[in-house]
Structure formats: C-alpha cells, structure tokens
C-alpha cells in the first residue's frame, strides 16, 4: 500500500530516534525523502519555521509536522504498508 501524500523526514544521521525510524523504513521498504538538518541549512530553517522547534525526527505529511519516533512509525505502518 502506498500513499498519495507528500512526505519528508527531517532527521540527523546521529540521532538514535531518527535511526529507529529509518531502520523501520529500510526493513519495510518504505521510501521517504530525507532532509538532513545538519547538512542542509534550509531544511533546518524549514523545520523551525513550520514546526516551531528543531526536534527530529519529524515527518512532514502534506506540510504538517509529526514528531516522536513511535508516532511516526505508527503513521507509516498505517499509511504506507
């Protein structure tokens, strides 16, 4: 099952919660564009501007932020598998 929604995962490669989400995605064949806020200053600014905080992981779903790794995994499981 796929989704017609626009998705982006804002993350840092060293963040254990980001790694948890990305591992779930890898194990389940879920592909979501990644935005590394450490390497991409525009991504970091967007995260704060739209989401109101610099917290990762953050899954943007049609431009709306969803935080917390367990919540992100639950959403991905329900909407992309």
Feature-to-residue mapping (PLM):
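Short secondary-structure transition/capping segments
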Residues: 2-3, 45-48
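Polytopic alpha-helical membrane proteins, predominantly small-molecule transporters/carriers
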Residues: 69-72
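Thiol-based oxidoreductase modules, predominantly thioredoxin-like and allied folds used
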Residues: 30-43
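C-terminal basic regulatory modules in eukaryotic proteins
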Residues: 61-62, 75-81
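Local sequence-structure signature of Cys/Sec-based thiol-disulfide redox active-site neighborhoods
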Residues: 1-30
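Short alpha-helical
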Residues: 16-17, 42, 67
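A short, hydrophobic beta-strand/beta-hairpin element that forms part of a small beta-sheet core
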Residues: 57-65
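Thiol/disulfide oxidoreductase modules built on the thioredoxin-like
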Residues: 48-55
């Amino acid at each position: 099952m796929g989704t017609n929604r626009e998705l982006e995962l804002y993350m840092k490669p060293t963040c254990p919660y980001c790694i948890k989400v990305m591992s779930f995605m890898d194990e389940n064949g879920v592909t979501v564009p990644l935005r590394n806020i450490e390497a991409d200053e525009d991504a970091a600014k967007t995260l704060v501007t739209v989401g109101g905080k610099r917290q990762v992981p953050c899954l943007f779903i049609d431009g709306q932020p969803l935080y917390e790794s367990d919540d992100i995994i639950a959403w991905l499981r329900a909407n992309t598998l």
